[in-house]
Amino acid sequence: MIIDPPIGTGDRIRAKLQGVGLYATVRMGLLKGFRLLRSRWHRNQLVRPSYRVDGPALVAALGTTPDQLNRVLERLKVDLGNRLPFDPAKLPAIRAYYREQATDELAAMTESAEQVCHHVFDLLGSGPVSLGDPIDWHRDVKSGYRWDPTVYFADIPHGQGNGVDIKVPWELSRGHHLVLLSQAALLTGGEKYARECTALMTAWMEANPPGYGVNWACPMDVAIRAVNWIWALALLVDRPEVTTRWFSEVIASLVAHGRFLMENLEVRDDGVTANHYLSNVVGLLYLGLCLKEVCEAGQWRAFAVRALVREMERQVLADGLHFESSVSYHRLVAECFLSSAALCRHHAVDLPSEFHHRLEKMCEVAAGYTKPNGLAPQIGDGDNGRLHILTGYGHRDVRDHRHLFGLGRVLFDRVEWRAAAGPSWIEGLWFGATPESEPTATAAPTGSIAFPAGGFYILRHEQDYLLLNCNPPGTNGVGTHKHNDLLSVELYIDGEDILVDPGCFLYTSDPQAYNRFRSTRAHSTVTVDQAEQNRLIPGKLFCLHPDSRVQVLQWESGGPVERLVAEHDGYERLSHPVRHRREIFVDRLNETWQVTDRLTARDDRSLSHHVEWTLPFAPQCSLLPARTGWYIVTPFQRLWFEGPWVSSRDKTINPLPHLDEGLVAPQYGRTQRAPVLRWRWEGVLPVECRFSVSRAGNEWS
């Protein structure tokens, strides 16, 4: 019997020591003990800092006197419009460009703005839902659950389960729709968009006093809200709807946001910082640079600039991949850094050359992993997270990361990124780009590329794309958003997805579904003895025990034949250890993509092992069985799946795979049915399995 040992306390401590070191491990233990003691004080409501900023507090925050308050606010109003990277002087040219050359974008923007005016939102896969009037900011529209708005933020649990998704009210309260309304008002002159924007901000402030309710429970969302409020406010600041009285209320709320963030930075007990902490930093950077009249702004700005540089070094690997093992979070973090870099440049705040160098590499990574159809693979967790949505609100696929190139084009003068950005290149207009000065677009490179530090290996040529995932548990071994997807394959042929990563459906609202989607068995890889590549930690969602290491043994790219060989040792912890090696062979002349797996025992005992292969196909694929394989039928082509052929001890068999109905999550909160092929083998190792996909298939039989 093969035994997968349980995770003991010693295992956890050793993993922490390897991932973050002795100091951080001791720190984590002390902080957890302190939190248990401190929780008694919270339960007795003895510790309740107030973050409300009323009239006298706003006067003090601005370092002025009551009789001078309006003068200070008027000066801030005048200056705020020039404190974002957006150049108001270019507005006539931008408006003309949208009306004459980006008519589809303008139409989609106004259509989405109309939906918001009617309080219709699509929140994390809910589909268009009317939230009524007034909007209930404390309700999860998908489950109907409502959080008590009088509960202090620190007392709100984050994981109710039973279908209750705390991320839904958080997403709504991030305020992405406010920037949309302000843009629509700016480009169309529509008064109702400006009125709706100010009305929604007023309604939110009245329903969400600082520090109370679900929408203050996560500092990351507080920070993102601050950024979006500043964008909306700066774009509308010259309009009559922005009265001095209303403006003062918003500034008071933003001061509360800044103070809240400084006191509630999201640092893990082990000292590890990730995308949440970075979002906190970016929120403080925006507040510090755009609200310079606030007395604490200098402190916020100085802290944020230091932390921004430090987090680039901590979170972004040498080849440009973000360290949390998720493509979706790579996009979010890249957006945070790009937006911050543009803001710093606008305010003449110098950032180190190494910061810019690594940020440019983040964009190169996104260009590398983007498929020919403009969409990114769904590797690791994904919650549709964005810092701000300046193009494509409500109508662009959340897997489209090309807006990064629109901003990257402005920062790094990479001419080829205009073509890579597709319609999202106009993101750059909101960061200072001039439409008339844009050169003729050039084709983006389409060659194979490897990102060894992050573990993405991509074999691509024209309209064909294959990605082998070799990224280990990230976040310094914590694996916050990592899935058990080692050596899994994404395959895209002639404009269509064939093999796909199933993505991520839900987080805390359905822990069982979350674990299913991140399991080894959900991905196009091999499961040995029903074990996970990295063990799931009972009771903990956003982490994996770091059991696996990956080694790439061969990488040959660029010719008519390309080869990639890699292996992982995640199954060597088993009582009878096993190593999995996978070879990818691409023959471009014969248009064939072949996968060969070898599983070998790491000891001399002749013991039987249970091995299972999983291949999740894209939803548009249909599979039809044939004598020695399967036909893969899509709306635009027919491919041939040859095999599988399983060889062990001089004997080769052609096991009959079982066709299952699986699920693919194209975005958080939404699934599609998709075919899954599975086959199993049981016996004494070593065993080798080979299968291939080709355009040149057998005739129908």
Language-model regions, residue ranges each:
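CBM-like, beta-strand-rich accessory domains located in the C-terminal region of large
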Residues: 223, 382-383, 389-394, 405, ...
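C-terminal substrate/ligand-recognition segments
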Residues: 175, 493, 595
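Extended, charge-enriched "interface" segments that sit outside catalytic cores
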Residues: 31-160, 167-171
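Beta-strand-rich N-terminal accessory domains
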Residues: 20, 28, 40, 56, ...
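Carbohydrate-active enzyme catalytic cores, enriched for enzymes
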Residues: 321-499, 504, 553-557
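Residues that flank catalytic or metal-binding motifs in active/ligand-binding sites
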Residues: 173, 280, 362, 453-455, ...
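Boundary detector for helix-to-coil junctions that initiate low-complexity/charged tails
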Residues: 1-29
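Aromatic-lined, polymer-binding surfaces characteristic
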Residues: 146-150, 155-159, 165-363, 375, ...
